[in-house]
From Swiss-Prot:
Compartment annotation: Secreted
Residue numbers annotated as active site: H75, D113, S193
GO biological process, one term: proteolysis
Pfam families the UniProt entry points to: Trypsin
Cellular component GO terms, alphabetical: extracellular region
Gene: splC
Signal peptide (residue range): 1-36
Alphabetical list of InterPro entries matching this protein: Peptidase_S1_PA, Peptidase_S1_PA_chymotrypsin, Peptidase_S1B, Peptidase_S1B_tx, Trypsin_dom, V8_his_AS
Protein name: Serine protease SplC
Family (UniProt): Belongs to the peptidase S1B family.
EC number: 3.4.21.-
Organism annotation: Staphylococcus aureus (strain MW2)
Length: 239
């Protein structure tokens, strides 16, 4: 049977199931089939590297790049202020990760959609005595460079409320690099803004800022970490 027909049939059955309550497992199976089409998998253990280097906002993603320091987008950070909160590598379990207050926000001075945040070291919620940020996460390292056709992965929190703040990983390849812009075909959705783009060594080469939301799109975009951008980030990593 044609694969597309199978997927559509399963989706129709899932809708019926949600109404009748026949079998909730069918819904989950349908979602798994759809994600397989997109090369997307749910992260099973967010407490191991590189997944423990990814953090969640209420509707976006960020990642750890150094002591008490995370990277996201300007269009994400504009909705936050000092004292607001982020959550380290949640996995849908309210006891996992730790919730931390934002201490400072520094936007990149150019047009590139990058913002650096510094975080209070002690969690304000979760853990019997509060998690320590730097003991609870593992910072990502910069890649030296990248080139077209390199394999990449994107880790983040697509549709975070709908997906109960579970972490997902999508895979693909770099399609083009021009100046500070990197285009790739890994599938992304709303909520992936601020996600790290990693190479096969789990080194970060850029930060996602937007995409088409279509399977196979080659125009999903990230800010490519040039030497100038890396220098800006390094200057804002807490010492």
């Amino acid at each position: 049977m044609n694969k597309n027909i199978v997927i559509k049939s399963m989706a129709a059955l899932a809708i019926l199931t949600s109404v009748t309550g026949i079998n909730a497992a069918v819904v989950e199976e349908t979602q798994q089939i759809a994600n397989a089409e997109k090369n997307v998998t749910q992260v099973k253990d967010t407490n191991i590297f590189p997944y423990n280097g990814v953090v969640s906002f209420k509707d976006a993603t960020g990642f750890v790049i150094g002591k008490n320091t995370i990277i996201t987008n300007k269009h994400v950070s504009k909705d936050y202020k000092v004292g607001d909160r982020i959550t380290a590598h949640p996995d849908g379990d309210k006891g996992n990760g730790g919730i931390y207050k934002i201490k400072s926000i520094s936007d990149y001075p150019g047009d590139e959609d990058i913002s650096v945040m510094n975080i209070e070291e002690q969690a304000v919620e979760r853990g019997p005595k509060g998690f320590n940020f730097n003991e609870n996460v593992q910072a990502l390292n910069f890649a030296k460079d990248a080139k077209v056709d390199d394999k990449i992965k994107v880790i983040g929190y697509p549709l975070p409320a709908q997906n109960s703040f579970k972490q997902f990983e999508s895979t693909g390849t770099i399609k083009r690099i021009k100046d500070n812009i990197l285009n790739f075909d890994a599938y992304i959705e709303p909520g992936n803004s601020g996600s790290p783009v990693l190479n096969s060594n789990n080194e970060v080469i850029g930060v996602v800022y937007g995409g088409i939301g279509k399977i196979g799109s080659e125009y999903n975009g990230a800010v490519y970490f040039t030497p100038q951008i890396k220098d800006f980030i390094q200057k804002h990593i807490e010492q």
